[in-house]
A protein has these predicted regions:
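Short, Lys/Arg-enriched N-terminal segments with co-localized hydrophobic residues
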Residues: 1-17
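Conserved mixed alpha/beta catalytic, RNA-binding, or beta-rich assembly cores of soluble enzyme
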Residues: 18-77, 88-97, 118, 127-128, ...
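Ser/Thr/Gly-rich flexible loops in soluble cytosolic domains mediating phosphotransfer, phosphorylation
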Residues: 100, 104-136
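Flanking helices and flexible, charged tails adjoining ferredoxin-like Fe-S electron-transfer domains
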Residues: 7, 59-61, 111
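Active-site charged/polar residues at nucleotide-handling catalytic sites that mediate phosphoryl
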Residues: 80
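Structural motif
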Residues: 83-84
């Protein structure tokens, strides 16, 4: 016979059954005219920047733009268990504050992946940022 209570407790303590909670921050101006299909397709198919989660359960907890009150958004992500924030590929390519946004996310304790779809190096040679949250 299997004691499911012990099995569940074991998996919780060892990280089994854990779902990695992810959020995506998109460039505010781009979001006004983009359906975000590239970001969502990459997430759903676990390709490009999301390939690293191929063998993990993931949940997309937040998907919003980086404008407005970013501190409030980060607090909401934290409250909802997000551990990793992906900055959209358009943020890397079109937002002058890309590096600052990445650092702000890391300072709030999140791991940061600096792109969503396409390559880690953009067509114009810009390399995606990868940061580990500072409070870890």
């Amino acid at each position: 016979y299997i004691d499911y209570g012990i099995m569940i407790a074991y998996n919780v303590l060892t990280g089994g059954f854990m779902t990695k909670k992810i959020a995506v921050l998109v460039n505010e101006d781009t979001m006004q005219r983009c359906s975000c299909g590239g970001c969502l397709k990459a997430y759903m198919n676990k390709v490009d920047s999301f390939e690293r989660y191929a063998d993990e359960d993931t949940e997309l907890v937040g998907f919003t733009h980086s404008g407005g009150d970013l501190e409030k958004k980060l607090a909401s992500f934290k409250k909802n268990g997000v551990t990793t924030i992906h900055l959209s590929t358009c943020t890397r390519g079109k937002n002058d504050n890309y590096e600052s946004i990445a650092r702000q996310c890391a300072a709030a304790g999140f791991d940061v992946v600096g792109y969503t779809h396409g390559g880690a190096v953009s067509k114009d040679g810009k390399v995606a940022i990868e940061l580990v949250g500072e409070s870890k």
